[in-house]
Amino acid sequence: MTRRIPERGDSRHLIERGMSSVDMAGWRCGILGSASLIEHLRKEHRVKRICLTGGLASGKSTAIAYLKAQGASVIDADKLGHIVYETGTQGYRKVIDAFGEDIVGGDDMIDRGKLGAKVFGNPDELKRLTDIVWPEIRHLAELEMNSYEALYPDGVVVLEAAVLFEAGWEDMGDQVWVIAVEPAVAIERACARDGLDRDAVQSRLDAQLSNDERVAKSDVVIENNGSQAEFFESLQAAWEQLNQ
């Protein structure tokens, strides 16, 4: 029987009490035990940590939906990135200190447009930003992983991150899974899904790591160049191998 894993939405009562997602992660860890207890549970029950990545239009969202249906706990690095910018967080303060008070809007939130204008087309400034944001995301992801492991010490935790290798997070998992898609297939899918022209999609692909670069750093390669049914078969095979 597949165990249902609670997501953020299942903690609405905590949100109503004014607790942020970060607070909830700390609350879970505090209630369920110390770091030493979590480490003990890992050793006793062999929690499996998976890092999942892939390029543009590779099928990461479809893979995540599949893994959730199998009972995996999923951590979305992109969503954690939004938390980093939330008013009052450590990341919020660091970004403002680095890029100036003028990136703050009238609602005291960081104006992503103003921030983007400062880093777009400027590799040095972009690196300056990611050097702040990526470690903060990693910290939040570790909190979430520990929380889920304490709740379900015999389960599977998946960290989904498009920038897994760029950020240096591949060491957070027992296995790294990559979804590989041929560039021509990715372009067709992205154009149909996002309404972008081919040149725009090609530019985005060119800015990412290649399939070969990702595959060289991964433990499990899942190809997604065919039908959705074929993709599900590949995911099922990887899942079964993981749980042998």
Show where each model-derived region lies:
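Walker A (P-loop) phosphate-binding motif
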Residues: 45-72, 77-79
